């Protein structure tokens, strides 16, 4: 999964937290669009902490989170993350983190990228009892025929597959439109080829079509059905050199931009004329025709591992 040096930066959007008490609080009800109403299967705080610390880091100072994804809605940026705090509390503190107890997601938002409001926990295992875990979310939105904006929140159902939750509000209530993963390691195009079908990255292009990337040890891309909860056509490979995990997909001025985490190898077999990347870094590829495997071009190592900047080495 998209794991995990527990550091936080607005610039890199790598969300985590320091285990310290919070003193500054602001009621979510101050903004009419952020009422703390009762939402099924969402744990909402009575008082929502709102940080005003300098540059706004860490985004949440009272819990561990990771693997952020974000969507803009009505002038606010809504961020969703893996709830590492659930693992921490279940095992009783620090120790080997195998992530198996993480079955929820965290919500927060900001309208200025400095002051962050905590919107509570999405209880994924209550909404979708069939899941094993919920890690590394990816979200997108689209206005549908009913005139409402629909939110589509994809997540890793352990390493085996990718699930999806839907809502007509960025803070829920959320529902599970399927009683199983959207894709998993038994899905044609993934089965027998990828070690994992997790770490989703979703985007909707300027024609309104949804696209999803998944994979661990290899990368796969698929066009989503109009309903955003089905696959439309074959699943195709993206030949991402030394692929490890942490898939994400964006669409920028007609170009599909795929980002991923490179593995820990020494790259003596680096297959491209470009400069070799650094160990376990973030890299990106681009394409105009995403289902044509040969169209994907490796571009650059855009973010080195934290270890290259004097911090501890970690996955991504």
Model feature map: region roles:
Residues 1-30:
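Bacterial Sec-dependent N-terminal signal peptides
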Residues 29-316:
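Carbohydrate-active catalytic/glycan-binding domains of CAZyme proteins
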């Amino acid at each position: 999964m998209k794991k995990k040096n527990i550091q936080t930066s607005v610039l890199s959007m790598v969300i985590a937290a320091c285990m310290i008490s919070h003193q500054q609080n602001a009621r979510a009800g101050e903004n009419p669009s952020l009422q703390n109403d009762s939402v099924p299967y969402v744990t909402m705080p009575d008082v929502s902490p709102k940080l005003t610390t300098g540059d706004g880091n860490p985004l949440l100072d009272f819990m561990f989170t990771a693997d952020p994804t974000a969507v803009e809605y009505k002038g606010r940026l809504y961020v969703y993350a893996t709830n590492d705090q659930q693992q921490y509390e279940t095992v009783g503190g620090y120790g080997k983190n195998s992530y198996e107890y993480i079955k929820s997601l965290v919500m927060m938002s900001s309208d200025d990228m400095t002051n962050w409001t905590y919107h509570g926990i999405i209880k994924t295992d209550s909404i979708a009892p069939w899941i094993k875990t919920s890690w590394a979310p990816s979200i997108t939105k689209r206005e549908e025929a009913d005139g409402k904006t629909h939110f589509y929140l994809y997540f890793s159902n352990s390493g085996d597959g990718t699930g999806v939750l839907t809502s007509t509000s960025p803070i829920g209530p959320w529902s599970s439109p399927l009683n199983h993963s959207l894709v998993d390691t038994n899905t044609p195009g993934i089965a027998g080829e990828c070690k994992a079908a997790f770490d989703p990255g979703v985007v909707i292009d300027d024609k309104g079509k949804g696209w999803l990337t998944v994979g661990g040890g290899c990368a796969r891309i698929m066009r989503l059905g109009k309903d955003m909860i089905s696959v439309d056509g074959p699943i195709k490979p993206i030949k991402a050199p030394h692929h490890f995990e942490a898939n994400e997909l964006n669409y920028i001025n007609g170009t599909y931009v795929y980002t991923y985490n490179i593995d820990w190898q020494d790259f003596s077999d680096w297959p491209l004329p470009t400069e070799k990347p650094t160990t376990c870094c973030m890299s990106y590829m681009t394409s105009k025709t995403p289902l044509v495997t040969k169209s994907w071009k490796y571009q650059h190592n855009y973010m080195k591992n934290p270890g290259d900047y004097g911090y501890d080495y970690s996955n991504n």
